């Protein structure tokens, strides 16, 4: 029951982030660029959630995001899957208690995910390659995501610890003889 409540909470957070991304940060852009809050969500799910559940949840969130606002189904699902997998891989080598480490992981995952999404859009939509515009957008998005992580990290860490405790409950039952 706790796991179902936690998954429902994740989906509620997803819809809140969708509202923030589309309405609030649509007004507060930096040079016309909005942060990608979904990469941050997928990264933190990869860091704190059980590695068995994370790919499925992030793929489902990505498909929902594709249905809501994308012209190609599957790109956001792949992007969020890559971000969550990056979080799973990085957590083996780094501590999730360090804010600087999380910021560096976020910078790397934002760059990798946006690069993959850009390449997939070029392949599928056959658009022109604009390297300078891409690097301008990605650098502003990285700065924006990093600032949001700096500000929201205590809240995210508290939620992440709750999720982690929910999905990694001790299954040990002691017997007294």
Set out the residue ranges of the language-model regions.
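Terminal, non-globular segments
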Residues: 1-177
């Amino acid at each position: 029951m706790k796991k179902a409540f936690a998954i429902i909470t994740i989906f509620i957070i997803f819809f809140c982030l969708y509202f923030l991304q589309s309405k609030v940060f649509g007004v507060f852009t930096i040079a016309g660029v909005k942060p990608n809050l979904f990469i941050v969500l997928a990264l933190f799910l990869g860091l704190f959630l059980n590695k068995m559940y994370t790919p499925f949840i992030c793929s489902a969130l990505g498909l929902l995001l594709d249905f809501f606002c994308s012209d190609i189904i599957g790109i956001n699902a792949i992007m969020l899957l890559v971000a969550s997998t990056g979080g799973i891989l990085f957590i083996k080598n780094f501590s999730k208690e360090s804010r600087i480490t999380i910021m560096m992981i976020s910078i790397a995952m934002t760059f990798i995910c946006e690069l993959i999404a850009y390449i997939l859009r070029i392949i599928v939509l056959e658009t022109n390659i604009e390297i300078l515009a891409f690097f301008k957008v990605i650098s502003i998005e990285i700065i924006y995501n990093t600032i949001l992580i700096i500000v929201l990290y205590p809240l995210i860490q508290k939620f992440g610890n709750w999720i982690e405790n929910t999905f990694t409950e001790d299954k040990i039952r002691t017997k007294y003889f």
